[in-house]
């Protein structure tokens, strides 16, 4: 190995030695370090253009952008256009917003350009960073989608950044839930489109239910940038986006099933640590008997029959509602309505409902009015939707713990972007023996900080925990109030969503005390001194030590702890965080804790090992679940893609009668294979019935004789010829264009209907596969095999139904 002693003495000048050391360090640097070094060099080249771009007039700046646009559309690579484009966007930001991108933001944008997850800490300016890579990809004219965490932030970011884009000639669109198709189409036609992930996904689903290509609103999936990527791509990866249709009122049924399940005792079901529930043999017997008594199960039927799958499914959903979902943790009841609570952020999610009849089961449990059950017409998970983009990138404050997941599921690297100013926040944690001791420590920490005017944020993992801490504060002389003041605290949780922006805006003021559920995804920085800016208040908050973040429990994932801590110490501000947890907390259940001698918290190193083990176990389990989801989802995705391609081909086919003829011939072949195989006995009676039912033809069918193969060929040709003649007559009578338009619409409607049914079958199959006692490595192959069989059935049903509709045209019903 080369070492410094091998360099000739005459060559050992300081400059040569430094160059040698630099080359050596670059060789041994990590890939992350080498990447950042490369990005920093590019950032320096962008900054070197500062004088040149500052000298340009607004018109000249716009002309430079137009020139880059022409080069991109003529085939120039985006890599080649990066430096001049970033320099122009940086200057546009300076002129319109009064702030130019700093080096770290340029580095973050370069990571995004390369299709990575940029990990940028709270307050580092992700919104401004996004404009660089959005403008670069917009040059090609294919559209850029920026997915914000919620509607408020999407609208805020679009309006805030719009002047930058406008100066350079880029149009900005905004997708919101209430706008109509014309407005959506116009928004997607813009160079850069802001919105929330769910709206992008739902528009994709709606587009693939349209009957004409010019009715669609999206124009492709070139580049997507996902803000708070961990929430959308990791936490919500398996959340289905669904378009639903009504099934009708079934309130009495849900109440009857809930009453039966409510009567079960612990011997009737088993719960495991993964929050799964299963009926025991005694449970099946009890349910079977109760369903018969209620008249919901026929006397000669069984819960294990195929015909009873749907009924058993409703029973299991009622059992899950009763045993797994807890009020004020998973949902709240507000105004006689069950409202889901985001498990990570504590936000209420009004309008979002659990699917597959689980929400109706909850409404029955809580004796709320039961919403109409819907049938899913089309659905897609966030994971599947965002993997459709040619290029995907994301931004988040915490990605380091999911590096492998981003890589395996999305093919994305994670790049940790250095902060603009050094982090000086101090972090600590204490693990107490009981929850009461932990709450007492939280109170003592709060009292000490409040005495010197330090702003305090207390983070809790759930609404129930938030209420518990609030009760403790009130019992000790604190007053819950919207107004800030001595010994007053504001509450920010899913029950007070409307006050969220105002509460957060003032959480950094001196003496402010804010009690909140999990803060991840709130989307608003906590600025020392509060908002609007007040220099004196900021100095007072800084002098008191900056924001103090107190956690009352550790979250199941380290990333969530980091997000809460990250509220303090933004952009080099002073700050401190401490977690006062206890071995009674939900995270540590099932993890035996060593008994500590005496009073006081556990020894720090022991506590850290215990918490790390519990969090790593939860994270590994969650990762395994999401990885399994991605593999099962990939099977469904391939079927969806095949249907989408077939649907587009039908929708855009100028001569659909050729496809109808092919489907008719395939249908006749199906019937012959089933009822008149060339090497086996014929079932003439059922063949005749099928020909009459599907083809609406009366074709004399004789016994095949000795040469079945020849007879089968002849019969198939004869049936085909008669069917062709019939259709030719219909085309002549109605007109090729008219009959083609009718059958095109028939085929599209049939595909949509069959895919709706297929989606339900596949979801039921996923659950059934999971309940089977199979080795883990056999679950996916089993699902693939049975899903393929279901897809073949769908294809067969499609060609038979199309043929039947075509042959019935003009016949009396």
Swiss-Prot record:
Name of the top EC class for this enzyme: translocase
Keywords, ordered alphabetically: ATP-binding, Cell inner membrane, Cell membrane, Cytoplasm, Membrane, Nucleotide-binding, Protein transport, Translocase, Translocation, Transport
Segments passing through the bilayer: none
Matches recorded under Pfam families: P-loop_SecA, SecA_DEAD, SecA_PP_bind, SecA_SW
Taxonomy, superkingdom: Bacteria
Protein's name in the database: Protein translocase subunit SecA 2
Protein task: Part of the Sec protein translocase complex. Interacts with the SecYEG preprotein conducting channel. Has a central role in coupling the hydrolysis of ATP to the transfer of proteins into and across the cell membrane, serving both as a receptor for the preprotein-SecB complex and as an ATP-driven molecular motor driving the stepwise translocation of polypeptide chains across the membrane.
Species, as recorded: Rhodopseudomonas palustris (strain BisA53)
Reactions it catalyzes: ATP + H2O + cellular proteinSide 1 = ADP + phosphate + cellular proteinSide 2
Record carries keyword Transmembrane: no
Record GO biological process: intracellular protein transmembrane transport; protein import; protein targeting; protein transport by the Sec complex
E.C. number(s) listed in UniProt: 7.4.2.8
A Gene Ontology cellular-component term: plasma membrane
Subcellular location: Cell inner membrane; Cytoplasm
Membrane-topology descriptor: Peripheral membrane protein
Assembly mode: Monomer and homodimer. Part of the essential Sec protein translocation apparatus which comprises SecA, SecYEG and auxiliary proteins SecDF-YajC and YidC.
């Amino acid at each position: 190995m080369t070492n410094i002693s091998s360099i000739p003495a005459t060559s050992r000048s300081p400059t040569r030695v430094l160059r040698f050391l630099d080359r050596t360090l670059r060789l041994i640097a990590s890939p992350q370090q080498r990447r950042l070094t490369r990005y920093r060099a590019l950032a320096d080249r962008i900054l070197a253009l500062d004088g040149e771009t500052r000298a340009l007039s607004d018109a000249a700046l716009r002309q430079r952008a137009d020139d880059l646009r022409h080069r991109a559309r003529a085939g120039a690579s985006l890599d080649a256009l990066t430096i001049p484009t970033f320099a122009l966007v940086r200057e546009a930001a300076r002129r319109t917003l009064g702030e130019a991108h700093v080096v770290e933001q340029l580095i973050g944008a370069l990571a995004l350009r390369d299709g990575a997850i940029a990990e940028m800490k709270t307050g580092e300016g992700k919104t401004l960073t996004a404009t660089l890579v959005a403008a670069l990809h917009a040059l090609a004219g294919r559209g850029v989608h920026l997915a914000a965490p919620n509607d408020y932030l999407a609208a805020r970011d679009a309006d805030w950044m719009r002047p930058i884009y406008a100066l350079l000639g880029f149009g900005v669109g905004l997708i919101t839930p209430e706008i109509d198709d014309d407005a959506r189409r116009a928004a997607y036609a813009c160079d850069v489109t802001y919105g929330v992930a769910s709206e992008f996904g739902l528009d994709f689903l709606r587009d693939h239910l349209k009957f004409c290509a010019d009715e669609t609103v999206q124009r492709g999936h070139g580049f997507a940038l996902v803000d708070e990527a961990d929430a959308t791509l990791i936490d919500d990866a398996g959340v289905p986006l669904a378009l639903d249709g009504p099934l009708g009122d079934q309130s009495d049924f849900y109440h009857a099933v809930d009453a039966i399940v409510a009567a079960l005792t612990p011997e009737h079901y088993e719960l495991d640590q993964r929050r799964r529930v299963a009926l025991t043999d005694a449970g099946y017997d009890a349910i079977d008997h109760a369903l018969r008594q209620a008249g919901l199960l026929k006397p000669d039927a069984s819960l294990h029959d195929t015909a009873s799958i749907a009924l058993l499914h409703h029973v299991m959903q009622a059992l899950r509602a009763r045993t797994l979902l807890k009020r004020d943790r998973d949902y709240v009841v507000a105004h006689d309505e069950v409202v889901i609570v985001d498990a990570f952020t504590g936000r209420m999610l009004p309008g979002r409902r659990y699917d597959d009849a689980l929400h109706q089961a909850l409404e029955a449990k809580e004796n709320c009015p039961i919403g109409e059950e819907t049938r899913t017409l089309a659905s897609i998970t966030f994971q599947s939707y965002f993997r459709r983009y040619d290029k995907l990138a994301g931004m988040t404050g915490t990605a380091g713990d999911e590096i492998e997941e981003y890589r395996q599921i999305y093919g994305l690297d994670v790049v940790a972007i250095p902060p603009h100013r050094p982090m000086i926040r101090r972090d600590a944690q204490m693990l107490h023996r009981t929850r009461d001791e932990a709450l007492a420590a939280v109170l003592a920490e709060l009292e000490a900080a409040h005495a010197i005017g330090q702003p305090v944020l207390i983070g809790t993992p759930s609404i129930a925990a938030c209420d518990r801490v609030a009760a403790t504060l009130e019992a000790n002389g604190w007053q819950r109030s919207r107004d800030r003041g001595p010994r007053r605290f504001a509450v920010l949780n899913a029950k007070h969503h409307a006050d969220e922006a105002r509460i957060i805006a003032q959480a950094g003021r001196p003496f402010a005390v804010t009690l909140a559920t999990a803060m991840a995804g709130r989307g608003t920085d906590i600025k020392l001194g509060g908002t609007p800016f007040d220099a004196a208040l900021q100095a007072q908050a800084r002098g008191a030590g900056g924001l103090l973040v107190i956690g009352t429990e550790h979250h199941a994932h380290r990333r969530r702890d980091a997000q809460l801590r990250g509220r303090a110490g933004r952009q080099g501000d002073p700050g401190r965080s401490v977690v006062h947890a206890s071995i009674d907390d939900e995270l540590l259940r099932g993890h035996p804790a060593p008994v500590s001698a005496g009073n006081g918290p556990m020894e720090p190193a022991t506590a850290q090992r215990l918490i790390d083990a519990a969090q790593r176990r939860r994270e590994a389990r969650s990762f395994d679940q999401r990885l399994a989801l991605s593999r099962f989802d990939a099977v469904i995705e391939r079927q969806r893609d095949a249907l989408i391609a077939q649907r587009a081909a039908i929708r855009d086919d100028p001569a659909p009668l050729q496809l109808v003829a092919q489907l008719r011939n395939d249908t006749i072949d199906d019937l012959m294979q089933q009822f008149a195989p060339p090497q086996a006995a014929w079932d003439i009676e059922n063949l005749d019935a099928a020909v009459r039912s599907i083809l609406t033809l009366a074709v004399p069918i004789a016994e095949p004789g000795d040469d079945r193969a020849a007879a089968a060929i002849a019969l198939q040709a004869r049936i085909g010829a008669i069917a062709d003649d019939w259709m030719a007559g219909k085309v002549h009578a109605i007109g090729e264009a008219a009959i083609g338009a009718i059958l095109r619409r028939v085929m599209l409607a049939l595909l949509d209907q069959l895919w709706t049914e297929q989606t339900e079958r596949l979801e039921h199959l996923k659950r059934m596969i999971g309940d089977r006692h199979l080795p883990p490595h056999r679950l996916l192959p089993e699902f693939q095999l049975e899903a393929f069989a279901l897809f073949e059935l769908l294809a067969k049903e499609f060609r038979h139904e199309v043929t039947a509709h075509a042959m019935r045209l003009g016949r009396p019903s």
